[in-house]
Amino acid sequence: VIASVRGHCYTGALELALACDLLICADDARFCDTHGKWGMVPTWGMTNRLPERVGPLVARDIMYSGRVVEGVEAIQIGLANRCVPEAELEATTNDWAETVATNSWHTLREEKKQMRLLAEMTREDGLKWAREKGPGVAPDMIERIQEGFKR
């Protein structure tokens, strides 16, 4: 899932964007957590996802202060994967989605599953799990390799 953000992305919208796998924003994007301003507490995963994405120190700053993070800074702190001029956001998002979609959906699904699963393990246990229990190949591997040789 790719979040494509332009303009304001505050509080609940930020929580939804953080739930996405990838995030692209326009240079006019503004991210902010206003839970504290309104006396609310995050319930959609921000307290997990924001520190995972930007690190605990930066997450505390954003959450405790309620400060605005501009699009370019979002790249610098790891909140967004890409930042583009607002006029190019839709086309760039579509191009990115098409590029991702050309890959094996079996592989993408397994990678996403493994990233979630292995995040809960030690590095050593995660490497062992991937080596011993990871599928290693996707069901469409042979077909995709054969198609690659035809080009």
Residue ranges and their predicted role:
Residues 66-72, 87, 91, 95-151:
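C-terminal alpha-helix plus adjacent terminal tail
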Residues 1-105:
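Crotonase-fold acyl-CoA enzyme core
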